[in-house]
Amino acid sequence: MFDGYDSCSEDTSSSSSSEESEEEVAPLPSNLPIIKNNGQVYTYPDGKSGMATCEMCGMVGVRDAFYSKTKRFCSVSCSRSYSSNSKKASILARLQGKPPTKKAKVLQKQPLVAKLAAYAQYQATLQNQAKTKAGNSAISVEGFSWGNYINSNSFIAAPVACFKHAPMGTCWGDISENVRIEVPNTDCSLPTKVFWIAGIIKLAGYNALLRYEGFENDSSLDFWCNICGSDIHPVGWCAASGKPLVPPRTVQHKYTNWKAFLVKRLTGAKTLPPDFSQKVSESMQYPFKPCMRVEVVDKRHLCRTRVAVVESVIGGRLRLVYEESEDRTDDFWCHMHSPLIHHIGWSRSIGHRFKRSDITKKQDGHFDTPPHLFAKVKEVDQSGEWFKEGMKLEAIDPLNLSTICVATIRKVLADGFLMIGIDGSEAADGSDWFCYHATSPSIFPVGFCEINMIELTPPRGYTKLPFKWFDYLRETGSIAAPVKLFNKDVPNHGFRVGMKLEAVDLMEPRLICVATVTRIIHRLLRIHFDGWEEEYDQWVDCESPDLYPVGWCQLTGYQLQPPASQSSRESQSASSKQKKKAKSQQYKGHKKMTTSQLKEELLDGEDYSFLHGASDQESNGSATVYIKQEP
């Protein structure tokens, strides 16, 4: 592992060096710094200085920074190129019967200072162009920085291992604090990119707080970066790639022998796996491609599906355009593992309602997505005791994901799928029924909310409050769905209350926002969108593909919505008061009546209470309805 540190003070010679014709290199004095990048002329301690011209490329530079004793070449690459040309000329001379040139000497290792200074000058223009390009491509979202946000508030982020569907989610175990990596050295005035070793101080999803080796307890130059970025490498990568390791300018005079320092510091330390970047690349390959056809829920009529076409794929998230959309603006966002999308023919196979397309044949280039690419549901046995129409249960309201409501099974489909209606809110034609699988983590047996101290939303118009299941079942002549039929699996998900993450706003699924886990009930997570009121919170399963680690948006190039500011919330409040939006069934901004409004309407201010949860972060509701939009 320590072979990589030779590049800190020496350059590893190649196997062809024995044939090169350059003379032996005079070693630099041991007390000379590894690199002087303070703008002064490169000189030896005895004060000698001057200029030289490279005999290979013609570059003019400081003589002391040139390569070899004779200072004929600006870099080892020019020296070797010159030697290669000389060798070819010698062979040609032999073929022509001319006497050969003198025998080449063995090329010895060259101290880094000479090679690096000339190489830096040679690549200055290219490096500046690269910096300009990088600066132009950077996306700034109102100046939001996960690193600053976490540091200033002492937040913690959910580990990447909590998100099995995310890149590297299943192979993140080796990444931890104190792991050493090679990263670009930004504390350097050289115009070319050089590297140095840094240790992970803190992890926040894909992001890591790093500290350069040599700073010890000094945090003045600590910085955040995305571990899956292209400039992050395991220790030893620089040596294998011929890249220079240069200590930061702030501490360059701290040690006279940096190689010995690194060997001592890194003995027994962990680094990234050698194939880490390859694993990152492989984990970001997605089988869904543009022009694939799928069946997806109709966002205007939740009880049915429609055909849609994959327009784009970003980090496994699909932008689907409904096939009949002429201007291609009628779209829907979801993850490729979402339970809302299915293969063509799925609706017919299970008896689900389906909106037939007016398009009689496939458009050119469009093709059906292979069925094996879709998420598999758990097989169930419907031959014995099973769900029946009319049975009561509790379910997350798909049109108001902050609430768990009294619900009814309206239809039993094939393969374990159920059509669920929210009591008191159903349309007469059943157009707002929603399809859940029997193993879905979004449906619960009667009494789940009471046992877990979650507020259960009663049917709209139901006046006998507080709501009691026993009384309601008797009044409606209904029975509760058997508890044993529900999914009771609780994975060891690793989430903790207070953890930060990036979460899809499922009411506006094109938006991914800064969010916090505020409550955990078995496998159920309550997700709060930072900067927004609690009425916008959403109940989400721990294995939902709509949750991502901190840094996911940066990694995939998706736009992250920062926490809403006070001014934006106030403007939202003002606009909502001026214009009340009509009720719709879209996954887009629809919000039902809040608890406070329901209380005022039903009881005219009389005291009442629901079953409150044990968490201090439980939503209290609000009398004002805001429509959450992009900040």
From Swiss-Prot:
Region (Disordered): 1-31, 563-631
MBT repeats: 144-248, 256-353, 354-459, 467-563
Pfam families: MBT, zf-FCS_1
GO biological process, one term: positive regulation of DNA-templated transcription
SUPFAM superfamilies: Tudor/PWWP/MBT (SSF63748)
Keywords associated with the record: Acetylation, Chromatin regulator, Chromosome, Metal-binding, Nucleus, Repeat, Transcription, Transcription regulation, Zinc, Zinc-finger
Biased composition (Basic residues): 577-593
GO CC field: NuA4 histone acetyltransferase complex; nucleosome; nucleus; site of double-strand break
Predominant location category: nucleus
SMART domains: MBT (SM00561)
Domain of life: Eukaryota
CDD domains for this protein: MBT_MBTD1_rpt1 (cd20120), MBT_MBTD1_rpt2 (cd20123), MBT_MBTD1_rpt3 (cd20126), MBT_MBTD1_rpt4 (cd20129)
Biased composition (Low complexity): 564-576
Zinc finger (FCS-type): 45-80
Gene Ontology MF: a single term: zinc ion binding
Disulfide bonds: none
Modified residues (N6-acetyllysine): 115
Subunit field text: Monomer. Component of the NuA4 histone acetyltransferase complex. Interacts with EPC1; interaction is direct and promotes recruitment of MBTD1 into the NuA4 histone acetyltransferase complex.
PANTHER family referenced in this protein's UniProt entry, alphabetically: MBT DOMAIN-CONTAINING PROTEIN 1 (PTHR12247:SF79), POLYCOMB GROUP PROTEIN (PTHR12247)
Its biological purpose: Chromatin reader component of the NuA4 histone acetyltransferase complex, a multiprotein complex involved in transcriptional activation of select genes principally by acetylation of nucleosomal histones H4 and H2A. The NuA4 complex plays a direct role in repair of DNA double-strand breaks (DSBs) by promoting homologous recombination (HR). MBTD1 specifically recognizes and binds monomethylated and dimethylated 'Lys-20' on histone H4 (H4K20me1 and H4K20me2, respectively).
Listed name of the protein: MBT domain-containing protein 1
UniProt gene name: Mbtd1
